[in-house]
Amino acid sequence: MKKTLLALVVAAASTSAFANVDTQNSKPEFEFDPMHKDQFSVSGAIGLGGYYDTASKALYDDWATAVTVATIYQNNRLRGYLEIDLEMNYSTDESKKAIQSGPATDVDKAWLGYETDFGLLSFGWENDTALDKVDGAGDTTYEFGSSAGDTSDAFNVIKFEGKASAFAYGISTFETDDDREAAETGYNGYFGVEQEVFNIYAGYETRENGNEDEEIVSLSGNVKVGAATLGANFWVNDLETSTNTGKTETGYYLSGSYPVTEQLTLAAGYNGVTTDSQVAGTADVDMSRVNIAAMYTLNDRVDMGIDILQDVDTGDSAKDEETYVFAAMFYSF
């Protein structure tokens, strides 16, 4: 699972940078200045972290221990974004966790866009989809929150996102793989209301690949209650196949966080999922698990956290209830 805490740090910096550009300027919309160094800004983060679970009894990581560098380009209404990860992946037992130990590189995002008065229209060789921005709005924990099984990072992403008053919206089309013969083609979008006290979003995604069709409906949001934040994600993932071997997954995730001090925040969440198989004679499967997390901010550049996930009911008597741990520390620049 890649909630990509490191990328969230970078994304926050890039969002802030884009937000500082006023589209209501006197320059004509399609008039651009010659390329200059002042049109570029760089942000990033250095991370150290990883996972452990009682099933594999291995220590492993394929994203958190990395240097992420993002370059932002702005020229009037023209936008550009490039994010590269320089990773140091590892696994103490590659037979159980198939992660090759050693350095790796990844272009996490690469897109060009145009800022209109109603939102940002972009084309990304690799980018997040629209729904990925909001499907986990109800997760207030650190890493092991649960949400709809929609597409996150995708390829050839055409996306439009914007906000009008309190209403937020987004839509995208994408492919799930850089190999078009192997990729699924998908479409998703969301509509939401954003207020100072609460945020709520409804989303939809559809993907098709040959004889398989998948539809996802999600509802997510959060609300501030005093100093605490409460969140909830609800979803239905419906997979239909021509051989009637599909399934419908109905799930929810409830979470809450509370700042014990200005630096320390504690959080917890509960996840429940019911899977209804289309295969004749196959019983429904009910799964549940709980996670607790702590997040500590040392200063405006250094933060860290730990998240512990415990299976409550795997829904399968042959599977043990396992424990999963994630811990990481990040320095942003």
Please provide the spans of the model-predicted regions.
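Outer-membrane beta-barrel proteins
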Residues: 2-333
